[in-house]
Amino acid sequence: MRMKLVAVLALFAVCSMHAQDDLAQATIKGVLAGNQGQVVQLAEAFSEDQYDWRPAEGISSVGEALLHVAQANYYLALKMGFPPPEGVDMMELPKITGKDNIIAALKQSNSFVLGKVMMVQNDELAQEVDFGFAKMNKMGGLLAMMEHNGEHKGQLIAYARSNGVVPPWSK
């Protein structure tokens, strides 16, 4: 009995250590998924007509902001070594029109990057990457991905409130 207990405890310890191995990636994935989910909820709450609304000339419209998020997801993943899936042309994303098409493109990019977060290995987190706007390690790239989605969630909340749209999680 004592040997079984020791074996079970050893197995538990090994499993716990492995769970900690990807703690940073799992935490980032969780926060990123939450931000992405709320951005999609906001995207769905806007009417088709509101997708063309912009706070001022020269500022991104609702639809443009959503497509920017989708495009940036692919861009950041690409810089970390994960090219976009077959059939996705990053340069064509800004040309997508229509609420349903924009939401579909956003959801596809969200799913893609969530799948890639856990593929970044611990021994790669310190590797330097030139993102074009900054040089940082892959950990910084994962954090930038999470922060960027959160930044535009805030932008879209302001857009929603300006148009009388209540964020669905605030009701």
Task: Give names to the regions the model predicted.
Residues F46-D49, V120-Q121:
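Short, solvent-exposed, charged loop/turn and helix-capping segments
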Residues M1-L23:
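Bacterial Sec-dependent N-terminal signal peptides
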Residues D21-D22, I28-G30, A72, K79, ...:
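Short leucine-rich amphipathic alpha-helices used at interfaces
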Residues K95-V129, G140-H148:
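Acidic/histidine-rich alpha-helical segments that form the ligand environment
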Residues D21-Q25, M91-K99, K135-M139:
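A short, mixed-charge helix-start or loop-turn motif at secondary-structure junctions
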Residues K29, A33, G37-V40, E48-M91, ...:
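Short, contiguous alpha-helical
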